[in-house]
Structures are given as structure tokens and as C-alpha cells.
């Protein structure tokens, strides 16, 4: 290999390393900007200023503001969806895995609090703004199936919507609150116990109401 080729390879490696460093600076800066202002109000110049890079360097790394948001959120979304799928299958096969699944999910969300908050509350105006609604609909479907199983009929849709909204709000409080991982896991377990007991009491009440209406 000639000296010229060696020099070219070294230069290429150095350029790649600088580009990666620039991208990481922009991702850190963008994460903070999106968390503070939300996607719609986040300013590219402020992101670049905080990262100490030029706007030209930004566009060399990312096509636009949404591409930066994608670099921040896509991996977390992929991991979250994979974990939900794996955990659902595990619990179906062995309900005793629920506590361990809850722990793993809380550990992951604790490590990615900022991304979770941006995704659920700060992504309006981006292609991710429907993610919260998607989660909401999935939970409504799961709640409806569960209630139907024990009631023999479909529950009131508005009741399910409110119950899901309350459950999601509880999860967001855990994510946003200044808790340790262990505290989040404990609180999630206690909230779950309360929710399970309340759900069964509600189903019993609703079944009783059905009997009253029959008479």
C-alpha cells in the first residue's frame, strides 16, 4: 500500500470519527432541546449552538430536524416494541414471569426517561405524534378483551377509555418522577396490585348490574 493510500485511509477514519462525534453532540443537544420545548418549538440553531457545531455540520449529519428526532427515538421504539412482544409471550406461557418483566421494563424506561417523555408528550408535529394514541388504542383493546372475558359482553367503551387514560398517566408519573429504579419497580408493583383488585371489584359490580337489569 502506497503512502498516499495509507494517508487517505487514515484521513477517512479520522473524518468518520469526527462525524460520529458531531452526530453524538447533536443527539445530546437535540434530546435536551426536544425535552424542554417539544419537537414543534425546538430550534435547530439553538441545538447547533448547544452542541457547538455549525448548521452546515448539522445538515452534513442529518437531513432535517425530524431526522435528528428519529436518531434519538427509533432505537428506543424498536426496543420497547420488542420487549412488549417478548414479555406478552412469556406471561402467556408463564404468568409467574410478570414481576421480572415489570422489572426489566422499568429498568429500561428508567435508562431512557428523556426519550420516553419526548415520545409520549413532546413529539407533536412530527411523525411520532401518533405513538401515544397507538399505545392508548392497544391498551384499550387489551382492557376490553380482559373485561369481556369475565363479563361475557363488551364493556362500556368510554369506561375503558378513562381507565386506560388513568393507567397511562400513572406510568408517566413513574417515568417523570425523581425516583430510583428500585422505587419505580416498587411503586409499579403496588399500583398494579391496586389496579388488579380494583378491576376485579369493578367487574363484579358490572356483572351485578347486569343481573339487576335482567330482573
Predicted regions and their residues:
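N-terminal intrinsically disordered/low-complexity leader segments
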Residues: 1-19, 207-215
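Short, basic, alpha-helical segments at the C-terminal edge of helix-turn-helix-like DNA-binding modules
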Residues: 44, 74-81
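Amphipathic alpha-helical packing segments from all-alpha helical-bundle domains
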Residues: 81-84, 104-107, 111, 125-151, ...
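Short linear capping/connector segments at secondary-structure termini
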Residues: 85-90, 118-126
Amino acid at each position: 500500500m502506497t503512502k498516499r493510500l495509507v494517508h487517505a485511509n487514515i484521513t477517512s477514519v479520522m473524518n468518520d470519527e469526527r462525524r460520529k462525534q458531531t452526530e453524538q453532540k447533536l443527539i445530546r443537544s437535540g434530546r435536551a432541546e426536544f425535552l424542554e420545548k417539544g419537537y414543534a418549538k425546538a430550534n435547530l440553531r439553538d441545538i447547533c449552538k448547544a452542541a457547538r457545531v455549525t448548521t452546515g455540520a448539522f445538515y452534513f449529519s442529518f437531513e432535517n430536524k425530524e431526522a435528528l428526532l428519529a436518531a434519538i427515538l427509533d432505537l428506543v421504539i424498536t426496543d420497547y416494541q420488542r420487549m412488549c412482544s417478548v414479555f406478552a409471550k412469556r406471561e402467556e406461557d408463564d404468568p409467574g414471569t410478570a414481576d421480572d418483566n415489570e422489572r426489566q421494563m422499568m429498568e429500561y424506561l428508567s435508562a431512557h426517561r428523556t426519550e420516553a417523555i419526548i415520545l409520549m408528550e413532546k413529539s407533536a408535529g412530527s411523525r411520532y405524534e401518533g405513538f401515544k394514541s397507538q399505545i392508548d388504542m392497544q391498551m384499550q383493546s387489551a382492557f376490553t378483551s380482559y373485561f369481556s372475558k369475565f363479563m361475557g359482553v363488551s364493556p362500556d367503551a368510554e369506561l375503558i377509555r378513562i381507565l386506560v387514560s388513568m393507567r397511562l398517566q400513572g406510568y408517566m408519573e413513574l417515568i417523570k418522577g425523581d425516583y430510583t429504579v428500585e422505587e419505580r419497580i416498587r411503586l409499579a408493583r403496588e399500583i398494579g396490585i391496586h389496579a388488579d383488585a380494583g378491576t376485579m371489584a369493578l367487574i363484579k359490580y358490572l356483572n351485578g348490574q347486569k343481573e339487576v337489569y335482567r330482573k
